[in-house]
Amino acid sequence: MTICFLLFSSYYFSNISPQNPLFKKNFLQQLSPQGFGFYSKSPTEENISFHTKENLKLPNALPNNFFGIKREGRVQAIELGKIVENIDPKNWKTCENNNSCTNLEKQIKPIKVIKNEDYIHLSKGEYLIYRQKPLSWYWIDFKQTTSFERKVLKIKIV
C-alpha cells in the first residue's frame, strides 16, 4: 500500500519539476508510460509517414539507444511534424493509386525549409511526406481494391 501511495504521489511532483524543452515534458513524465493516448486515438485518423532519399538515421533500434527505450530517435518525426504544421494545406497533392503517386512524387517541386535551431535532429535534404486515411477493415477481403486517397508533400531542408 505504501509503495502505491508513493508512486501515485510522485505524479504530483511531476507537475512542478522542470520541463524538457524539446518534448514539453518533465523527467518524471518521460519515465512514465504513454498513458491513455494509445487508447484514445481514433482508428480512422489519418496516418502520416515520411521517406527520404538521403541517409536519414533513425536510431531507435540501435544498442546505444537501448533498442528503442530512449526517445531521442523519435525526435526527428516530431520535428518533421512541426514543419508540416506550418505548411499551407493547399501545397498537398492528391493521388489515388501507387502508379499515380510515384509519378506525382517525381513531378512535385519541393518546398524549401531553412534549417534552424528548431530542427536540429533532421538532416538536410528532401523528404516526402504522406497523409492517408487507413483502409477500412470492410475492404480487407477485396484484394483488387487498389484505389485510395493519399496526399503527398515534398519538402527540402536547406
From Swiss-Prot:
Classify the source by domain of life: Bacteria
Q: Does the keyword Amino-acid biosynthesis apply?
A: no
- How is loss of this gene reflected in the phenotype of the organism? When the sdpA-sdpB-sdpC operon is deleted, increased rate of spore formation; a double operon deletion (sdpA-sdpC plus skfA-skfH) makes spores even faster. A single deletion mutant does not have SDP activity (active peptide of sdpC).
Q: What induces it?
A: By Spo0A during nutrient starvation. Repressed by AbrB during regular growth when nutrients are plentiful, in association with the transcriptional repressor Abh.
The record's annotation in InterPro entries points to: Sporulation_SdpA
Q: Which GO terms describe its cellular component?
A: cytoplasm
Pfam family of this protein, just one? Answer: SdpA
Q: Where in the cell is it found?
A: Cytoplasm
Q: Which GO terms describe its biological process?
A: bacteriocin biosynthetic process
Q: Which UniProt keywords apply?
A: Antibiotic biosynthesis, Bacteriocin biosynthesis, Cytoplasm
Protein task: Required for the maturation of SdpC to SDP. Not required for SdpC signal peptide cleavage, secretion from the cell or disulfide bond formation.
> In its UniProt entry, what is this protein called?
Sporulation-delaying protein SdpA
What is the originating organism of this protein?
A: Bacillus subtilis (strain 168)
Q: Which gene encodes it?
A: sdpA
